[in-house]
Amino acid sequence: MKGYKNYGTHLREKYNGQRVFKVIVDGGFTCPNRDGSKGFGGCTYCNVDSFTPEPSRKMPTIREQLEEGIKRARTSYKADKFIVYFQPNTNTYAPTHYLKMMYDEALSINTEDIVGFSVGTRPDCIDAEKVALLESYADRFDVDLEMGMESIYDETLEQINRGCSHGEFVAAVKLLENSKLDLCVHTIFGFPWETKEMMHGYIHEINRFPQIKFVKFHHLHIVEGSIMGAKYKKEPFKLFTLEEYTDLLCELIPMLRPDIVIQRLFGISDWDLLIAPNWGLNKSAIQTYIDKALEKREVVQGSLYLD
């Protein structure tokens, strides 16, 4: 038995042992720090090109994406039920009436097997009207809002061209007090100018907000097509080894509030995009390595949590 609340177990328990799989939908959204409203280039760690369809390539419709994704998940993973996951870019960065049209289309497909709805966004692209829209689906689906915190330090957010402050993150989280939505928070550990003690601060901040039900932990990795990637090629900087990152997780997980479900422990990138760190293992092997280390060290989520 794992010493932390992992997402796979959470889904099996919630849906009576059925295999539940997230199906990613690209709604063609952009980001305010990419389109000029708050800046250009996007977050410096982000592969902008991967979100920019070639002019000659027609993006599949939402229906086509979902039907293909569900078919693939049934065949490859024996999935029974599905969560519609609007993931790439900022999926609330549009007028509410347009968002409703997009969401309605996605949630009208294969409705008997859709159990959840997940929307990825930024703190500065959510407001009360959009929260109300997402809540309107909560009587039919389990709805979660996935929001990028990335770092709690404004100097870091400025360096990575995030285009929003930690104060905006806190304000967005407070919008979800007493909400029907579950909040998932995304963090990145390993910015080279942040100390381990600073990263501990992420956990203390997450613990403050009872509306945070899920977390995704990522280590910083450098990919082709990113601003940070170009800088790294010119002048490499320190990144986590697998052993160092595992050590950090062994420190952080005991500090994490015990009711929070960990959806992800590390980031992953396509091999053809990854510049560094190359740990030489696939996703499954990394997960196994980390889980074995956590078990060996008898790490228990919440054992060092201070209410």
Where are these regions (language model features)?
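N-terminal [4Fe-4S]-dependent radical SAM core
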Residues: M1-T44, V48-I83
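Auxiliary Fe-S-binding modules of radical SAM enzymes
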Residues: K2-R12, N16-F21, H221-D307
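Hydrophobic faces of well-ordered beta-strands that scaffold small-molecule active sites
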Residues: F21-V25, F82-V84, F117-V119, V143-M147, ...
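Conserved SAM/AdoMet-binding glycine-rich loop
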Residues: S76-C164, A171-A172, E177-N178
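Active-site-proximal loop/turn and secondary-structure-junction residues that shape catalytic pockets
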Residues: P88-T92, P123-C125, M149-Y153, T187-W193, ...
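Short, electropositive alpha-helical surface patch
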Residues: K100-A106, E135, T195-K213, L242-E243, ...
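Glycine-rich tight-turn/loop motif centered on a GG-T
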Residues: E155-H166, A230-L239
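Conserved C-terminal portion of the radical SAM core fold
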Residues: G167-I227, E243-F266
